[in-house]
Structure formats: C-alpha cells, structure tokens
C-alpha cells in the first residue's frame, strides 16, 4: 500500500460520511416541513392549561403530528404524576393559586 492509496481511500470514506450526513439532514428537513407551523405554540398552550390542574414537567408532554393522504392526526401524550392522595393535591393547588 502506497502513500497515495492511503489518501485516496480516505477521500472516498469522507465522501460517503458526508453523503450519509446530508441524507440525514434532508430526511429531518422533510419531516419538519410537513408539520404545521403552529405546533410548538399549541404544545406550549396545552402545557399551560394542563399545569392549571396537574403539576407536570415540560418533557411529560409530547405532541405528534402525522399526515396521510386523506387525514391529519394530532396525538397528544401526557405522562401524569402518580398521586397517592388526590384530595391533598387539590388542596395544594388551591393554596398555590392563592
């Protein structure tokens, strides 16, 4: 193996890595292009409404938008905290609101 062969094989590896990265970027761009622009704002507003009633973290909510040929689906998943005594939780929320 000569010195030229070493540099030649490195170039093809670099090109394939660059091509793979570009394909990933294009796939992400296509995925986000089909999402409605209001989705982040909708997620934030839903989170505010949910927090009025239940204390949840930001990462406890996920919004998924899917688009087929003839329908659009908005899926909302919320991981609610375990509550041992719901009455105490309601009382705590009332105290916090005052």
UniProtKB/Swiss-Prot annotation:
InterPro entries: MinE, MinE_sf. The keyword Hydrolase does not apply. Prevents the cell division inhibition by proteins MinC and MinD at internal division sites while permitting inhibition at polar sites. This ensures cell division at the proper site by restricting the formation of a division septum at the midpoint of the long axis of the cell. One of its GO terms (biological process) is cell division. Gene3D superfamilies: Cell division topological specificity factor MinE (3.30.1070.10). This is Cell division topological specificity factor. Disulfide bonds: none annotated. Keywords: Cell cycle, Cell division. Signal peptide: none annotated. Belongs to the MinE family.
């Amino acid at each position: 193996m000569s010195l030229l062969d070493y540099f030649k094989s490195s170039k093809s590896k670099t090109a394939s890595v660059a091509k793979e990265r570009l394909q990933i970027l294009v796939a992400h761009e296509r995925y986000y292009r089909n999402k409605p622009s209001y989705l982040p704002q909708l997620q934030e507003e839903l989170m505010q409404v949910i927090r009025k009633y239940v204390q949840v973290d930001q990462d406890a909510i996920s919004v998924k938008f899917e688009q087929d040929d003839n329908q659009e689906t908005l899926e909302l998943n919320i991981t609610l905290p375990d509550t041992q005594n719901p009455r105490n939780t309601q009382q705590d929320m009332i105290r916090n609101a005052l």
